[in-house]
């Protein structure tokens, strides 16, 4: 399975053989080719990501999953050619074709109609687009039909090659129904590997597994005996294996390989050649406004250096041309900064032209033909995170990913280390007006930060503020007398509305340090009193010369004074002429549930100015995303609402577009062209460097990372679409065998016309009518969980039939789904025939784009009612869906009522992780030590909301990340037993700070996690339950919940032994 050079390189995936043909995907389309190799032809022509094409048993049709319309849906087309037909209108982000049934229906997996994205049920789809039949297996990852039915357990959602050597709770497991009676038992339960893609070849069950360290094809008899390996384990992973019942085809590193049989045949590579234009490899211009990265204005704001999709350009603000300063394909240039030397404007930026980051310098007027920008410090800077240039242009300050603060001398190129931190990276680099001092925000133990000062000549470093608070965003005032900054040192708590708690929700405020001991505070009384209004700033000339900054280090911390403004949420403080600017952010909830309407945009961020002379706050603009100040402090370069504007720094811009006080910079003059192949090579290499610099172990946990990159780099020549690249990067990340190594594309595939969903279960009845079987109830405390058919005035009930949508009759075969395409979030008229007969009604509803929140709340209500019924009302029930804001909200919806019962079942199954587990555990670990008995009222426990009796947790393989941690913490703290199965096993965390040049998010497992009782052992293993209770396919099919049943039994048994705490009687 080593890489060889094909006649026409292409990145081939998801093969399926049938007879003399093989179907596969390449270039974001489905193709067919002769199984013995040769020229391929397209089946689809949508140029969107597709997967898992499967040829029908009779060889006449091919079905696949397409994202043409946004969410993945099932499509089918004739093998001989012709238009494709869309079979599903499910709107689920987890839908996938997996094959065909023996009777000619398409076999697909989907979470449609489920309460969780982890529950992908198998369905059989008729080719006429009629209702699918749900197969009685429960959540599965694959179905192999043959002599017996074999199921693959539902995975977390990623392939084995994307997390190689994974051994956690969701590692693929095989179940077989040997007696064909619906009773499944484990197959190969002793195989320590991650199993996927099972299928029958004759009387042998074949599958992929990596139990020998590399994904390979294996097979055995139905009883698990005679296990054989059919492909080597010294190369790339074998992926996407499929069969026509005799031959097997699989993918590996973008190539297709075949085995003629499982009786000793050797794998051989298929020589498949593609034709066509390969449009995704053609160069194209980009829209500069859409791909705007950052900008830096010159001294007087006549022009700016602008970063656009890896290039740096100079743009004049009012008319005039734009010119490229750095736009070489396959090189990423970023963080441009302007400076002035001898009256001439210059630009410096970060480049990866030589691989590791370096600085490049060029005049704003551009380089002479054939000249190149001056490059300094290549390989000495690490990953550059922040950049600042001294006002005199003599040096550049750099904050590196490894905590270093560096100074790079422009003339000599010397790199000097100023300081370094073991607690993260520095930020807010800023020079004094005379270039003699550098200030920055220096990290301490999270979340603390302090300000530091360095003399740029002798590099002596002093503390400007003590390490007590979070001090950030420093800026020297333009007269050099003060250092302004932001700090979260306002302690004015607010009482929680739902529970007894206090929070500091607006703790930041701007502060100022007088640098010389003899400089008075600008906010105090002035010897000569306050001046009247200053003259028009436009008419005020720059002061003579550059002001000198004198700093008396002794007593600096005692000279900190707050600006006379209220505490709020502030960011990005900058100095301007006669004042300072900052962004003030509105206080909003994380979920947006407190908005007047869920669809409303976030409140605006305000750009504010504090006038140091007049001692007042001025509002310069709203909806500010980002800003920079010109060198003379008179103008602001503002990025707002997708536009780059130039406005005054001392007053609100006029409403007159393109006036002197409201200039919109025309970015359409920027000419930046993307050459995809070159850009993808740069992205591949940058991904490798960022992982090298941030992975939780410097030795890459024993993986030869350079060797990995070298091995996969030739595969890059096959890549023809962005989806190919994403898959390749996933596989490269997967070589580390570590959780949280993600690759997430920016998105944008499909038409954007999202499927409308009605929040109800519908089915086709014998009379041909599509009737409502159940209307899901709304959860009034969650705006995302509104039920369209339960809205006031709709009055649609179970049994009613939907006969028309928007005036178009519902097809008795396909139902209302096709008529609801593109209706999500829009008013739609339904024509409804009541179940008891009578006149049809017309109701206006607003369909949903996502039913999961609605179905989730209904599932929780069902589980809670079940626990109450089984325990006679003695046990409470809480489900925690994640360790983020949604999960925190969900806990508190029913905390008071459920915790007040005698015992508590805490269900953390399918917990998606996050970072709030310590808050959850803090709630669960409370113990009652007293009671408050007010007259005429019920007693309350002390502390409040503490469990009265036993707590039992329920976990499954989909409890992951912080969902792993919460279970380990529950065990370590002795809160109660954990029931279920081993959890996901991924606890090396990430911060999601890096995006590639095209917006693709890449993550680096950086934050290793140690847990009492497990040490480092939760990663790639999971947390073992105290009481193991698997949920078998037959349990799902029968609607049984043995894990919850066991938790209830344990809690009731504990109550028998130790009754719940109750309030005492009054003396």
Curated annotation (Swiss-Prot):
Q: How does activity depend on pH?
A: Optimum pH is 7.5-7.8.
One Pfam family this chain carries?
Answer: PDZ_Tricorn
Keyword hit for Transferase: no
Annotated GO biological process: proteolysis
Name the residues annotated as catalytic in the UniProt entry: 740 (charge relay system), 961 (nucleophile), 1019 (charge relay system)
**Location of the protein in the cell:** Cytoplasm
Q: What is its EC number?
A: 3.4.21.-
Give yes or no: UniProt keyword Protein transport: no
- The set of disulfide-linked cysteines is none
Q: How is its activity regulated?
A: Stimulated by MgCl2.
Please give the subunit comment from the record.
Forms a homohexameric complex; it is not known if it assembles into higher-order structures.
Q: Give the protein's recorded name.
A: Tricorn protease homolog 1
Chain's gene name: tri1
């Amino acid at each position: 399975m080593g890489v060889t050079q094909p006649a026409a390189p292409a990145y081939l995936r998801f093969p399926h053989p049938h007879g003399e043909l093989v179907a596969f995907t390449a270039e974001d389309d489905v193709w067919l080719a002769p199984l013995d190799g040769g020229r391929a032809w397209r089946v689809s022509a949508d140029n969107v990501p597709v997967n898992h094409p499967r040829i029908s048993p009779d060889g006449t049709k091919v079905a696949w999953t397409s994202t043409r319309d946004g969410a993945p849906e099932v499509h089918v087309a004739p093998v001989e050619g012709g238009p494709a037909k869309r079979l599903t209108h499910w709107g689920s982000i987890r839908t996938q074709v997996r094959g065909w049934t023996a009777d000619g229906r398409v076999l697909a997996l989907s979470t449609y109609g489920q309460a969780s994205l982890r529950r992908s049920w198998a369905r059989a789809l008729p080719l006429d687009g009629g209702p699918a039949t749900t197969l009685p297996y429960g959540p599965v990852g694959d179905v192999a039909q043959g002599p017996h039915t074999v199921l693959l357990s539902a995975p977390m959602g990623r392939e084995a090659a994307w997390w190689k050597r994974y051994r956690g709770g969701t590692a693929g497991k095989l179940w077989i129904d040997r007696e064909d009676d619906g009773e499944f038992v484990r197959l190969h339960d002793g195989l320590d590997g991650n199993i996927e893609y099972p299928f029958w070849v004759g009387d042998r069950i074949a599958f992929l597994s990596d139990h020998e360290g590399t994904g390979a094809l294996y097979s055995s008899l139905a009883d698990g005996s005679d296990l054989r390996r059919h492909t080597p384990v010294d190369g790339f992973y074998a992926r996407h294996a499929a069969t026509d019942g005799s031959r097997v085809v699989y993918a590996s590193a973008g190539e297709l390989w075949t085995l003629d049989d499982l009786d000793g045949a050797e794998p051989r590579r298929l020589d498949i050649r593609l034709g066509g234009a390969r449009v995704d490899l053609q160069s194209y211009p980009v829209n500069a406004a859409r791909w705007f990265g950052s900008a830096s204005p010159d001294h007087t704001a006549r022009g700016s250096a602008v970063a656009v999709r890896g290039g740096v350009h100079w743009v004049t603000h009012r008319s005039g041309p734009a010119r490229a300063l750095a736009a070489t394909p396959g090189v990423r240039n970023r963080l441009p900064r302007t400076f002035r030397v001898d009256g001439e404007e210059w630009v410096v930026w970060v480049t990866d032209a030589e691989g590791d980051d370096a600085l490049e310098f060029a005049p704003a007027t551009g380089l002479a033909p054939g000249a190149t920008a001056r490059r300094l410090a290549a390989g000495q800077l690490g990953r550059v995170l922040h950049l600042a240039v001294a006002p005199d242009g003599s040096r550049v300050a750099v904050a590196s990913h490894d905590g270093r603060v560096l100074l790079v001398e422009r003339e000599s190129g010397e790199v000097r280390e100023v300081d370094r931190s073991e607690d993260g990276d520095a930020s807010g680099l800023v020079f004094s007006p005379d270039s003699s001092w550098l200030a920055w925000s220096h990290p301490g133990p999270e979340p603390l930060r302090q300000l530091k000062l360095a003399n740029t000549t002798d590099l002596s470093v002093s503390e400007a503020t003590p390490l007590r608070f979070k001090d950030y965003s420093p800026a020297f005032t333009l007269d050099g007398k003060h250092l302004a900054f932001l700090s979260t040192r306002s302690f004015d708590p607010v009482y929680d509305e739902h529970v007894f708690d206090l929070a500091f929700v607006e703790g930041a405020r701007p502060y100022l340090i007088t640098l010389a001991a003899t400089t008075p505070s600008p906010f105090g009384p002035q010897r000569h009193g306050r001046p009247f209004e200053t003259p028009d700033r436009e008419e005020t000339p720059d002061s003579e010369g550059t002001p000198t900054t004198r700093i008396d280090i002794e007593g600096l911390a005692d000279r900190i004074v707050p600006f006379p403004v209220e505490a709020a949420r502030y960011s990005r403080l900058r100095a301007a002429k006669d004042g300072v600017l900052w962004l003030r952010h509105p206080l909003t909830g994380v979920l947006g549930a407190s908005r007047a309407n869920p669809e409303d945009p976030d409140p605006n961020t305000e750009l504010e100015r504090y006038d140091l002379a007049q001692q007042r706050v001025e509002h310069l603009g709203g909806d500010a995303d980002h800003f920079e100040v010109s060198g003379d402090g008179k103008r602001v370069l503002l990025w707002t609402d997708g536009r780059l504007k130039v406005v005054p720094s001392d007053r609100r811009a006029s409403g007159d577009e393109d006036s002197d006080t409201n200039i919109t910079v025309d970015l359409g003059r920027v000419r930046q062209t993307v050459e995809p192949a070159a850009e993808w090579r740069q992205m591949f290499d940058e991904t490798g460097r960022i992982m090298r610099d941030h992975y939780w172990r410097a030795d890459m946990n024993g993986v030869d990372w350079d060797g990995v990159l070298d091995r996969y780099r030739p595969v890059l020549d096959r890549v023809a679409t962005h989806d190919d690249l994403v898959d390749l990067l996933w596989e490269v990340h997967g070589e580390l065998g570590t959780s949280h190594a993600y690759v997430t594309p920016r998105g944008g595939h499909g038409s954007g016309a999202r499927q409308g969903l009605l929040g109800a279960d519908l089915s086709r009845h014998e009379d041909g009518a599509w009737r409502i079987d159940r209307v899901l109830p709304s959860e009034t405390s969650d705006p995302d969980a509104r039920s369209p058919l339960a809205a006031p005035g709709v009055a649609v009930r179970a049994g009613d039939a939907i006969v028309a949508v928007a005036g178009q009759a519902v097809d008795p075969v396909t139902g209302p789904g096709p008529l609801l395409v593109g209706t999500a979030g829009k008013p739609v008229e339904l024509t409804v025939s009541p179940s008891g007969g009578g006149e049809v009604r017309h109701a206006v509803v607003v369909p949903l784009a996502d039913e999961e929140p609605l179905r989730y709340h209904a599932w929780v209500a069902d589980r809670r009612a079940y626990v109450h019924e089984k325990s006679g009302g003695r046990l409470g029930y809480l489900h925690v869906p994640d360790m983020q804001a949604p999960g925190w909200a969900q806990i508190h919806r029913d905390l008071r009522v459920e915790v007040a019962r005698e015992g508590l079942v805490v269900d953390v199954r399918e917990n998606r992780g996050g970072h709030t587990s310590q808050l959850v555990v803090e709630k669960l670990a409370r113990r009652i030590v007293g009671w408050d008995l007010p007259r005429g009222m019920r007693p309350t426990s002390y502390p409040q909301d503490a469990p009265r009796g036993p707590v039992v947790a329920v976990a499954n393989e989909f409890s992951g990340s912080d969902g792993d941690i919460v279970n380990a913490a529950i065990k370590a703290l002795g809160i109660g037993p954990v029931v279920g199965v081993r959890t996901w096993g991924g606890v090396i965390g990430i911060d999601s700070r890096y995006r590639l040049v095209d917006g693709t998010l890449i993550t680096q497992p950086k934050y290793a996690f140690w847990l009492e009782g497990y040490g480092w052992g939760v990663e790639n293993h999971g947390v073992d339950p105290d009481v193991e209770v698997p949920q078998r396919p037959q349990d799902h099919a029968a609607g049984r919940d043995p894990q919850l049943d066991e938790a209830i039994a344990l809690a009731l048994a504990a109550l028998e032994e130790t009754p719940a705490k109750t309030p005492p009687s009054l003396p």
